[in-house]
Swiss-Prot record:
Residues 587-615 are annotated as: Interaction with AKAP9. It holds the Pfam family Ion_trans. One of its GO terms (molecular function) is voltage-gated potassium channel activity. Residues 534-571 are annotated as: Interaction with KCNE1 C-terminus. Phosphorylation at Ser-27 by PKA; increases delayed rectifier potassium channel activity of the KCNQ1-KCNE1 complex through a macromolecular complex that includes PKA, PP1, and the targeting protein AKAP9. Ubiquitinated by NEDD4L; promotes internalization. The ubiquitinylated form is internalized through a clathrin-mediated endocytosis by interacting with AP2M1 and is recycled back to the cell membrane via RAB4A and RAB11A. It is a multi-pass membrane protein. It comes from Oryctolagus cuniculus. This is Potassium voltage-gated channel subfamily KQT member 1. Residues 142-152, 218-225, 283-298, 320-321 are extracellular.
Length: 661
């Protein structure tokens, strides 16, 4: 495969543009926004260039392709042409061996140095740590007279190697920081150099250069001034933790438990001051066996207090009198207990922080599983929607232009492309086990049409991308079963054309998509359930306690609604009855009382209805001119049945005459 030499950007763009047909120049404008140039690979002479033998379904009969050497007619006269068969992932790249971009190399170097992940990064940084540690050991040995001669000579050459190494690494770090948007340009590099860890690296390099330049006769740390700079080389140990994760963890623990630490330190400091002062008062005139006053000043007492309450106990100063010993013992028990508390607080804080990080990791695993479950559930729901937006993700986008076909790449290059894509996905944080849901592409049988004779089938088969998610729909081949079939001009193989519009989807396509979506939903549901499983007994206990708390809240809400509906017991239960029977205040007893009240109310309503019926019958009898039977019998116009019942008659039940007598 011949590839053109790398001309300037403008000339290469003009050459690519001139080789494109008129219908493709519009689509080639997308390459202007890409940092890579759009190049067409040519294999052999231009006459041997091949087009894809598949045409869009909307075209009834494709026009024969024009030679690249001939002038391209307008797009309207040329008619629709077959789409390009290049892989969309590499359509903007040259078919030659891909050249690594400058920004891509910067990004890989930056991630390798500043964001180490993987065993290669670990091996590199661990080796640097070992070299720095060995150099530090030789620096310590150079201060011992027994090993000074051997250590200083070896240390001199090690310092030269480390200065060159750290200086080169500092320059490479400064250069690779340009892949970040905030570190682009001169001011961006200065912003990167102002980082604390970058300042430490620069100080270490400069200090090492000063040590090597001032050292005489190959002897490092020869003068007293150079020995003072030796401390700066200890800062190389900070090179191991460039991200500052250790300091951030310590700072977060101290910030979270700042109140407890401040309280314990304050009380311990007060205990130290008072104990030192009282011991000084008791021991300021005491003389030891050698005739010397041990606590001659308050500063001596403070030194004794610090050594005692921190449980160091040098033994250089000891109380001599029994009063001083008693005061020292009492205050020591009190002060030591408070000075030991910060260690326990920090230890428990670190343990809680580690546990919190583990829970956060476990929770972060649930996020992609939950997102996949929501996505698949929505797709299952949307599969019943006949709108075109539901099915657009399964439609292959038609290319706007038409380009020349290139021979299939070698297996080695395709493997390199796959490996490169895997590395890019890994750098972007996408692990192989957490890939996004695949969207299958649907292909269908194209309409019967006349193919040009110079379109070989083998080249088409190699140009169509095969994937496990590709749904292929093919018709059975025609078999020559009799002599009449021999006269038919039949195709030996049925070609598959990608579906480019929703209207081309058939019913079996939609049914297949629904089945795939349902399967994806069940798989996502299973993964989400696995991610939701607790990984610790404490999580199980926490879930049970949270569930119990929610249950109690709901029970209280139900109790409040019942009190609002049927009333509280204190509203209709006398105080004397509350102490007699506790069970009468239960919900069942209250409901029984409500039912009794409803029954009494129903009886009253029945009585009122009977009285109203009697009044209605009396009124109807008067209207017809007839006398009321009771009036004819008694003749008493003041009969109470002739009038409406009073309030007492409705509320107080009537008594029988026998009971009244």
């Amino acid at each position: 495969m011949a590839a053109a030499s790398t001309p300037p950007r403008a000339e290469r763009k003009r050459x690519s543009w001139s080789r494109l047909p008129g219908a493709q120049r519009e689509s080639a404008g997308l390459a202007k926004k890409c940092p890579f140039s759009l190049e067409l690979a040519e294999s052999g002479p231009p006459s041997s260039a091949l087009y894809a033998p598949v045409s869009p379904p909307s075209a009834p009969e494709p026009a024969p392709p024009a030679s690249p050497a001939s002038p391209a007619p307008p797009a309207a006269d040329q008619g629709p042409q077959p789409p390009v068969s290049l892989d969309p992932r590499v359509s903007i790249y040259s078919v030659r061996r891909p050249l690594l971009a400058r920004t891509h190399i910067q990004g890989r170097v930056y991630n390798f140095l500043e964001r180490p992940t993987g065993w290669k990064c670990f091996a590199y940084h661990f080796t640097v740590f070992l070299i720095v540690l060995v150099c530090l050991i030789f620096s310590v040995l150079s201060t011992i007279e027994q090993y000074a001669t051997l250590a200083t000579g070896t240390l001199f050459w090690m310092e030269i190697v480390l200065v060159v190494f750290f200086g080169t690494e500092y320059v490479v770090r400064l250069w690779s920081a340009g892949c970040r948007s905030k570190y682009v340009g001169l001011w961006g590099r200065l912003r990167f150099a102002r980082k604390p860890i970058s300042i430490i690296d620069l100080i270490v390099v400069v200090a090492s250069m000063v040590v090597l330049c001032v050292g005489s006769k190959g002897q490092v740390f020869a003068t007293s001034a150079i020995r003072g700079i030796r401390f700066l080389q200890i800062l190389r140990m900070l090179h191991v933790d460039r991200q500052g994760g250790t300091w951030r963890l310590l700072g977060s623990v101290v910030f979270i438990h700042r109140q407890e630490l401040i309280t314990t330190l304050y009380i311990g400091f007060l205990g130290l001051i008072f104990s030192s002062y009282f011991v000084y008062l008791a021991e300021k005139d005491a003389v030891n066996e050698s005739g010397r006053v041990e606590f001659g000043s308050y500063a001596d007492a403070l030194w004794w207090g610090v050594v005692t309450v921190t449980t160091i106990g040098y033994g250089d100063k000891v109380p001599q009198t029994w009063v001083g010993k008693t005061i020292a013992s009492c205050f020591s028990v009190f002060a030591i207990s408070f000075f030991a508390l910060p260690a326990g607080i920090l230890g428990s804080g670190f343990a809680l922080k580690v546990q919190q990080k583990q829970r956060q990791k476990h929770f972060n695993r649930q996020i992609p599983a939950a997102a996949s479950l929501i996505q698949t559930a929505w797709r299952c729901y949307a599969a019943e929607n006949p709108d075109s937006a539901t099915w657009k993700i399964y439609i292959r986008k038609p290319t706007r232009g038409h380009a020349l076909l290139s021979p299939s790449p070698k297996p080695k290059k395709s493997a390199m492309v796959k490996k490169k894509k895997f590395k890019l996905d890994k750098d972007n944080g996408v692990s192989p086990g957490e890939k996004t849901l695949p969207v299958p592409q649907i292909t269908c049988e194209p309409p019967e049409e006349r193919r040009p004779d110079h379109f070989p089938v083998d080249s088409h088969d190699g140009s169509v991308r095969k994937s496990p998610a590709l749904l292929e729909v093919s018709t059975p081949q025609f078999l020559r079963t009799n002599s009449f079939a021999e006269d038919l001009d039949l195709e030996g193989e049925t070609l598959l054309a990608p579906i480019t519009h929703v209207s081309q989807l058939r019913e079996h396509h939609r049914a297949t998509v629904k089945v795939i979506r349902r399967m994806q939903y069940f798989v996502a549901k299973k993964k989400f359930q696995q991610a939701r499983k607790p990984y610790d007994v404490r999580d199980v206990i926490e879930q049970y306690s949270q569930g119990h708390l929610n249950l109690m809240v709901r029970i209280k809400e139900l109790q409040r609604r019942l009190d609002q509906s049927i009333g509280k017991p204190s509203l209709f239960v006398p105080i004397s009855e509350k102490s007699k029977d506790r069970g009468s205040n239960s919900i069942g007893a209250r409901l029984n009382r409500v039912e009794d009240k409803v029954t009494q109310l129903d009886q009253r309503l029945v009585l009122i209805a009977d009285m109203l019926q009697q009044l209605l019958a009396l009124h109807q009898g008067r209207c017809h001119g007839g006398a009321h039977p009771a009036q004819a019998r008694d003749g008493d116009p003041a009969d109470p049945e002739l009038f409406l019942p009073t309030y007492e008659q409705l509320t107080v039940p009537r008594r029988d005459p026998e009971e009244g007598s």
